[in-house]
């Protein structure tokens, strides 16, 4: 979905070399100092989003990549996207963000850059991420890895690279096994990397009609169990159903390093203060867990400024 800013509802930032962890309702560093993420989401870098390209119709990654290939051929398409991704975000940009008070990047991932087919694993995704992670290290910034496009797609929207018809992550068990294996692969690679602050396991899942919340919880449990076989260190972030905002069936926490996340945009159906005070802070207070605003913005600077101030209270 649309996003520019990320935020965590939890003090000044001092970059440390150890892993972050949860401590009650906050996230802390290796010195038990409270951390507040003030971050930027890299929409359109690895996972293409149609509205960011002003693409007419259903602008999924696959649709737009195919359109470019139809225009210039596969070899030129591959060359174009290689250059595009190499220049979309650079250390100069990260330094600029750091100098302007940001301390985190949320990076949307597409499973195909790690596993183009089930049980096939490649390094393409790591070759994209590693230079950015190193640049973040050099500029005192954290990275949150976000599975934006899961095998089969976790909703029917273009930004999950779905077919526009069915969220096949939920309807096909093979895709759930595939997602689990992809996250294990990523977690094993980054298990000793403290610049990676957390794994955001599924961006904005939407259960298909007829599927209850247990279907989403099962996937989260399988993924987390798989991650923990290779990586006991990193925080895991789970988003609720219906684009991240319905946590029915996902409480209480089922991992010691778990953070709950929601997304909020102008024009939502619920008043911000009511939503925040009655529901989302209720999760944090009742279950003593951190709460993270994974996306907010971006079509009103005035609204965005006000909501940022509200979340920082």
Which role does the model predict for each range below?
Residues 32, 107, 199:
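Residue-level signature of catalytic and energy-coupling elements of molecular machines
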Residues 3-14:
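Sec-dependent N-terminal signal peptides
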Residues 16-102:
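N-terminal carbohydrate-binding accessory modules
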Residues 20, 76-105, 115-153, 157-198, ...:
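An active-site-proximal structural segment forming one wall of the substrate-binding cleft
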Residues 108-110, 147-155, 202, 240-243:
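Short, solvent-exposed turn/loop segments enriched in Gly/Ser/Thr/Pro and often Arg
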Residues 44-46, 111-115, 151, 205, ...:
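Feature marks short, surface-exposed loop/turn motifs that line or immediately flank catalytic pockets
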């Amino acid at each position: 979905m649309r996003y520019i800013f990320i935020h965590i509802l939890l003090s000044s930032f001092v970059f440390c070399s150890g892993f972050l962890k949860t401590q009650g309702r906050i996230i802390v560093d290796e010195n038990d100092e409270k951390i507040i993420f003030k971050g930027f989401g890299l929409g359109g870098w690895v996972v293409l989003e149609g509205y960011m390209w002003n693409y007419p119709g259903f602008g999924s990654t696959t649709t737009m990549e195919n359109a470019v290939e139809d225009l210039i051929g596969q070899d030129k398409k591959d060359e174009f996207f290689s250059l595009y991704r190499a220049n979309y975000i650079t250390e100069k940009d990260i330094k600029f963000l750091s100098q302007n008070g940001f301390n985190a990047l949320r990076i949307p991932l597409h499973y195909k850059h790690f596993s183009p087919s089930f049980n096939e694993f490649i390094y393409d995704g790591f070759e994209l991420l590693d230079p950015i992670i190193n640049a973040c290290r050099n500029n005192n910034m954290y990275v949150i890895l976000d599975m934006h496009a899961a095998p089969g797609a976790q909703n029917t929207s273009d930004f999950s690279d779905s077919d526009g018809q069915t969220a096949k992550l939920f309807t096909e068990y093979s895709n759930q096994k595939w997602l689990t294996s992809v996250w294990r692969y990523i977690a094993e690679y980054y298990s000793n990397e403290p610049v990676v602050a957390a794994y955001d396991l599924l961006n904005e899942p939407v259960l298909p009609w007829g599927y209850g919340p247990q279907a989403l919880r099962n996937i989260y449990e399988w993924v987390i169990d798989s991650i923990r076989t290779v990586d006991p260190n990193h925080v895991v972030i789970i988003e609720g159903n219906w684009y991240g905002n319905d946590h029915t069936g996902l409480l209480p926490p089922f991992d010691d390093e778990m953070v709950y996340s929601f997304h909020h945009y102008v024009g939502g159906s619920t008043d911000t203060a009511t939503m925040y005070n009655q529901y989302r802070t209720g999760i944090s207070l009742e279950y003593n867990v951190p709460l993270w605003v994974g996306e907010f913005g971006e079509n009103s600077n005035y609204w965005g400024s006000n909501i940022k101030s509200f979340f920082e209270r």
